[in-house]
Swiss-Prot record:
Pfam families hit by this protein: Ac45-VOA1_TM
Gene Ontology annotations for the cellular component aspect, listed alphabetically: endoplasmic reticulum; endoplasmic reticulum membrane; fungal-type vacuole membrane
Official protein name in the record: Protein big1
Gene giving rise to this polypeptide: big1
InterPro entries attached to this UniProt entry: Big1, VAS1/VOA1_TM
Organism: Schizosaccharomyces pombe (strain 972 / ATCC 24843)
Assembly description: V-ATPase is a heteromultimeric enzyme composed of a peripheral catalytic V1 complex (components A to H) attached to an integral membrane V0 proton pore complex (components: a, c, c', c'', d, e, f and VOA1).
Transmembrane segments: 268-288
Family (UniProt): Belongs to the BIG1 family.
Membrane topology: Single-pass type I membrane protein
Length: 311
């Protein structure tokens, strides 16, 4: 009974350790931040990451993009959907990753800190927007994406949309512009994330701001295919304004992915699950075999040759 109690505690600890948490990324061209190395690009302390984000946003004349993607996991980056994001992460002088964060990033506090240091303009957008104003200096763009699906096919499509949307926004930057990119996530159905969602009044005000940014043009008439850029005339300045377009794809939802433990625990893959089952059978078998072998008793003269009978 005592051995079964110990086994239960060990299994419970393993399952708790494999429970999914939310990664947070920071990419920046801020010269004040130290250049990243293999040892300094990964952080395990949320406060260290938050301090680095505050320092990155404290520099004026910098374009900042904050993306909230609920349900994003570390193993999503092994699917090959983030080719543009990976390219930017390799090219950025400073990058920081908080792989396992159980706390949602407070973007409002980051924006408030940036406003205290610089005269910045803040734009809040929802994932349903089909047009985004371009990134520019002294502007913070906060995008709230829709929750990721648990179905593998639909999830892969959403991850590709996120990467393409990021590429479209990043393409609006000037070649010598300084920028910060923060990608935050939160577990699905997390009550703490409810405060980050844009309400109806704020979204309506942001929609009006987008129209003003486009110079009064109707973006619906100039809708582009996904992954393209549009250069639209700005009626206020008479110049060309680059606009990033984003369209939500419509994919059929198919349930051909992993379910159960494989979706709730990010490291609990089918391969590891089969390994655990094999160990559950092999280890007790080996233990019993060793006990049986050790219990075999052989007399001292068992292997002696029989004596010849004397006539």
């Amino acid at each position: 009974m005592f051995s079964w109690s110990i086994l239960f505690i060990v299994c419970f600890s393993l399952v708790s350790a494999f429970k999914d948490t939310s990664p947070i990324f920071l990419f920046s061209t801020n010269s004040k931040l130290p250049k990243s190395s293999d040892d300094s690009s990964i952080s395990t302390c949320p406060m260290m990451f938050f301090d680095a984000a505050i320092e990155a946003l404290s520099t004026c004349n910098t374009a900042t993009l904050i993306i909230h993607q609920p349900g994003l996991e570390v193993n999503d980056f092994q699917l090959g959907a983030f080719k543009h994001l990976k390219r930017v992460s390799l090219q950025s002088p400073y990058s920081l990753l908080l792989p396992y964060s159980k706390e949602s990033l407070d973007s409002q506090e980051l924006v408030h800190s940036a406003k205290q240091n610089c005269d910045v303009e803040v734009v809040y957008l929802g994932g349903s927007f089909n047009a985004f104003p371009p990134l520019q200096n002294d502007r913070i763009t906060v995008v709230y994406m829709n929750e990721l699906s648990n179905e593998s096919y639909h999830r892969s499509a959403q991850l590709m949309e996120l990467d393409e949307m990021f590429y479209n926004l990043q393409s609006t930057l000037e070649q010598d512009a300084q920028w910060n990119v923060i990608i935050a996530s939160s577990p699905l159905n997390n009550s703490d994330f409810e405060g980050f969602k844009v309400d109806a009044n704020e979204e309506e005000a942001n929609a009006e701001f987008v129209i003003q940014t486009l110079g009064g043009l109707n973006s619906g008439k100039s809708a582009l295919q996904h992954g393209q850029l549009a250069s639209l005339p700005d009626q206020n300045e008479g110049s060309q304004t680059t606009l990033a377009m984003h369209q939500t794809r419509k994919h059929p939802v198919t349930d051909n992915g992993a379910t159960g433990l494989f979706t709730e625990y990010q490291f609990f893959t089918p391969g590891l699950y089969m390994g655990y089952l094999a160990l559950a059978v092999l280890v007790p078998t080996l233990f019993i075999s060793c006990r049986l072998l050790s219990s075999i008793q052989i007399s001292y003269h068992a292997f002696d040759s029989p004596r010849r009978k004397q006539l």
